Amino acid sequence: MNFAEAADGVELAWTSEGEGEPMLLIAGQATSMDGWGPTAELLSRYYRVIRFDHRGIGHSGRGDAERYTTRRLANDAAAVLSAAGAESAHVYGHSMGGRIGQWLAIDEPQRVRTLILAATSGGRMPDSAAEPDSAAEPDKAALDALVSGDLARLEPLFFDSEWARNNLEATHTFFNSRASAWAKARHFRASREHDAWSELGAITAPTLILHGTEDRLTPLPNALLLRGHIARSVLVRVPGAGHGLHLDHPGTVEWIRQFIARRSG
């Protein structure tokens, strides 16, 4: 394990495996780098995979509350890239990690070769003057389950039941990152307050949007909105997938490989 130093001096734990073009994995809220589990292993067969713990999570330091915004967390991601000796990378963000990836692509476009956004959104609805698109909002039961932390309620929102039964270790690791209640609350707030709609047009990196058709935490209309706001984007709908499609649908790895190969050729 290695440590990068963030702008405010906080140490950020990171690791890498594999060889080839660098790929930075950005986890969702309150999820450690270990939560990428089998997906990181699959990707490391083709890329140099760089993973890290967000501030307040796992082996990383905490820092001040004011640093917990998706835009500032993108600065942390950039610090990890620098520490890893990667001037640029393919950036793959899941959920809040996708929100962080958006800011990295907006603020430091030279560092993002391609952008992969899984189960994420641009934040609050783009037209505040209009009625919000209720179809894009998480349903109340799903949001209540997320806040509760009850694994029995959370697991079906993320994973196919058969996959979860056959991947007990990966499921356990994903839901059991080391994090204080203080850090979890800051991550939740950062994710919920994310709003990048007005700046998504600045993203120049080729972008692959992966989204499950049954995602109740970040419903599919969010992906359609992202597709409309990011010029060089492609949307792949994953039939039957929930919020954890980055793990329980390993076929997404091949789609990512094909997407990167076409953009790099």
Regions found by a protein language model. Give the residues of each.
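Active-site loop/oxyanion-hole signature of alpha/beta-hydrolase fold enzymes
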Residues: 51, 55-92
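Catalytic histidine-centered segment of alpha/beta-hydrolase-like enzymes
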Residues: 241-253
